[in-house]
């Protein structure tokens, strides 16, 4: 009892849970009272060195019963794998020569508390019993049979069982090597310092499963875990790694409760809960065999064949038993298990086991009944659901299905790892000793642990067996998919592997009904090209899709960005492309009309000019003022020419000519007309005051005045050239519409609207001034001068330009600005030139060509007579007319012989007075 109290203090300092202490004390108390009888269900094999073994030979029993049905694969296969490995090692002269390995193998019944109670058997030899007060009937002290010393333990299977057992074994410094426990917390070398395993931890497995899920394009999954360390810690690792990897969301994390009376209801509720998130079709499972079987059955009851996409951990692996009668629900399931190979020697060994040659396995008879569905005649048979008698002649693999269980390889590797450690320890401590020397006998578990962590050999699968500083094996996994259709061999198919990185053969995968296309398990379908994701708060894998609008393109899946200034989005808005460059084309309707008018005007102007040159010395041509007439015709011609410059493809030369000729044609035209109207006005104003002719009315003076007016325009253009040299630009604002598809860059000269108005402003000023003079000279007789035709010309021109201004500026924001403004400007200039050409020149050309009899010189008058006649005409114009058409018209000129001396003497020259 003293030893028990000491152990209690030690366990208390280790902060064991109260329930563990209670179980431990009860078991130790029984051992201390001298109960040396071994449990009826255990295997004991004599040897120089004894290894412990923990295997889930039976499933959990119902409430109140420790053990349930026998587990043929996970239990018996694994247990026999240890016995097979012991046989191989004991028969190997090169491994532990002269040393025989024994074993003490116990059943954990897949329950951690029961396994803890059973594992106390391993520490009995290390507990010193106080027998001072115990005497036999003869007064002699009792003789106790000392239990064999267990130097190391192989097991356990479930992580929760291994954790419970590891807590007690570390107290007695007994090394432990597991063949199936993968819980990440067992990697904590401070808490489980005597624990090692030949399988990788779930942290590697979880990483592999995350990689699989991401490779299949699934970003919205649910997790399902059996209650306990393996399931809960596995899901915890998966969740943590998925968060670190990003792009993967957990829809639901469901835990499968244990120790419930009616578990069928629980599994039906779990399936219903998983269906609450229908888009989360992928379900990552960290569960034991029984829970996997029950969850598949519940899914089948819910008629969800083909809905769930199962991703199973190594507890599912490539096992057949959990899928029995639920193959349709499991079709397409992806499972993972540590990389392994079939141990052929074990197959031969196991299939040769019979009731006669395998009496050392105390559970083999029960396995025989379950495997062959028969009943043995021996008492204590548990097979009550059949009347078929076992003959003992049945053979495994012939009379029953047989497939090597997935963890057999790792059981063998675990036993060999312990054997290699003992071998090296024996060589170091017992170099000159055959068998187990006293030094090795007295060596503690810490020393053996050191040798275990340093082993490195090729295991039964040909892969290296080694441990890192935490006692973990490297991560190497095979990836399987359960396939039943379109295959000659239904079952698990190897589709990839994971060794630090994923290698997955997606082309070998298939899903329900043989479908090859990977089904979706996403919260929201991927956005279309040109749309960005707008995630929902708290669920980054769920989003709404928002189109990139305007001039934005999809920069990445979360962001829309504006295209550069000179680009627009491409058709699907996944990038940008250059905005097309346009200019006013010759074939455009906007250009055809101005060009047509300009060509007609140029032809007419050339015709008029040719006519005037041909009839240069005729009275009408001379009377119209030949010098200014040619100047005016030049201006009209330039007004037509500017149309071609405005439509031509812009370059530096074209832009230079545009600047020069844009206002020059109008300036020349209106400078000549202004000079004419000003001369008329001054002549008649001067005539009212005196008979002396005004100054500067000679042709030379008129040309000088006109030239000076034109030079102002040219000076302004030269200043413009100096301040802002001609250049071409591409204007992207002018044609940047709301719809990017219609956006265009306009190739044009670097001339702003304001500069155009400034260039035309001087000409417009001349036009307005000329109009004012035309109004003032409106009373001059029409046959005497050109004042009235000039007046009509200016009135019409003003109307044209008054219409031009609102059209030009009113379309400044229009997408058709280039076309409208260019067309408006050129047509306005064409109309202005045509009005002047038509009103001032066409009547004269008509007379010259069709009525040459009227093209004669009229009688000359003195300057005073001209003025007096004009004054009288102005007065008579207010009196009623006796003519039929009501005209108040006075003929001031008579036909006279110009060569008569009287004419030369009494009259001034007509040519000097007629305007």
Swiss-Prot record:
Post-translational modification: N-glycosylated.
Entry-linked InterPro entries: ANF_lig-bd_rcpt, GPCR_3, GPCR_3_9-Cys_dom, GPCR_3_9-Cys_sf, GPCR_3_C, GPCR_3_CS, GPCR_3_mGluR7, GPCR_3_mtglu_rcpt
Sequence segments annotated as region (Disordered): 874-895
Lipid bilayer topology: Multi-pass membrane protein
GO MF, any single term: glutamate binding
Record topology, Cytoplasmic segments: 616-627, 676-702, 776-788, 851-915
Glycosylation sites: 98, 458, 486, 572
Tissues with expression: Expressed in many areas of the brain, especially in the cerebral cortex, hippocampus, and cerebellum. Expression of GRM7 isoforms in non-neuronal tissues appears to be restricted to isoform 3 and isoform 4.
GO biological process: adenylate cyclase-inhibiting G protein-coupled glutamate receptor signaling pathway; adenylate cyclase-inhibiting G protein-coupled receptor signaling pathway; axon development; chemical synaptic transmission; G protein-coupled glutamate receptor signaling pathway; glycosylation; negative regulation of glutamate secretion; regulation of synaptic transmission, glutamatergic
Gene Ontology CC: asymmetric synapse; axon; cell cortex; dendrite; dendritic shaft; membrane; plasma membrane; postsynaptic membrane
Ranges facing Extracellular side: 35-590, 649-654, 724-753, 811-825
Subcellular location: Cell membrane
Residues spanning the membrane: 591-615, 628-648, 655-675, 703-723, 754-775, 789-810, 826-850
Gene3D superfamilies from the UniProt entry: 3.40.50.2300, GPCR, family 3, nine cysteines domain
Effect of residue 658 to W: Does not rescue axon outgrowth defects when expressed in a heterologous system. Decreased protein abundance due to increased proteasomal degradation. Loss of localization to the cell membrane
PROSITE patterns given in the database record: G_PROTEIN_RECEP_F3_1, G_PROTEIN_RECEP_F3_2, G_PROTEIN_RECEP_F3_3, G_PROTEIN_RECEP_F3_4
Biased composition (Basic and acidic residues): 879-892
Modified residues (Phosphoserine): 900
UniProt KW keywords: Cardiomyopathy, Cell membrane, Disease variant, Disulfide bond, Epilepsy, G-protein coupled receptor, Glycoprotein, Intellectual disability, Membrane, Phosphoprotein, Receptor, Sensory transduction, Signal, Transducer, Transmembrane, Transmembrane helix
SS bond list: 67-109, 249-541, 374-390, 430-437, 523-542, 527-545, 548-560, 563-576
Pfam family name, one: NCD3G
Subunit text: Homodimer. Interacts with PICK1.
Stored PANTHER family: METABOTROPIC GLUTAMATE RECEPTOR
Disorder this protein is connected to according to its UniProt record: Neurodevelopmental disorder with seizures, hypotonia, and brain imaging abnormalities: An autosomal recessive neurodevelopmental disorder characterized by global developmental delay, hypotonia, severe to profound intellectual disability, early-onset epilepsy, and microcephaly. Neuroimaging shows cerebral atrophy, thin corpus callosum and hypomyelination in a majority of cases. Death in childhood may occur.
Similarity field: Belongs to the G-protein coupled receptor 3 family.
Name of the protein described by the UniProt record: Metabotropic glutamate receptor 7
Organism: Homo sapiens (Human)
